[in-house]
Amino acid sequence: MKKITNKPTKTDETTLGLRGLCAKRASTICYMIQQAKEHGVQDGAAFAREAITKYGEDIGQVVKSKMKNPDDLLEFSQYFGAGADRDIYEMEVVAQDEDRFYLDFHYCPYVAEWQKMGRDPEEMAELCDIAMEGDRAVGASFEAFAFTLGETIAQGCPVCQIRFDKVKK
């Protein structure tokens, strides 16, 4: 596995505070899986995936309810990864049109927290994949486009590749 590089460039007080909240979520996910196993849940990771999927479904429905046209990828791009999230994850909009909405995350507070917790690279890659169930579920809330997770910081790549593509009918 590649060496993980995850260095923030945005360090204003608000962004750092919001990243702290993300770090709490990251450690909670990690500990929930660990505790589920200790309490006899055979597959703590599956348990966490299902819970995070439900969370993502809820977010997807909220976003959908705000949109005038839930088939419009440009309108969706005004809600997903908007606001403070852009700074928290140091997002770069790689493509944004009626057929594609591509984001690259240049920083991940989840990975930073898992590194502080001493998690090994393989576990971080799995934890990342579990955490991304939320975004997968957001994407699945929309029939007109599909979500794809490309490479991730947790895998040792320089960015997390978040991709939404219009589904051709």
Where would I find each of the regions flagged by the language model?
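N-terminal accessory segment detector
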Residues: M1-D129, F145-K169
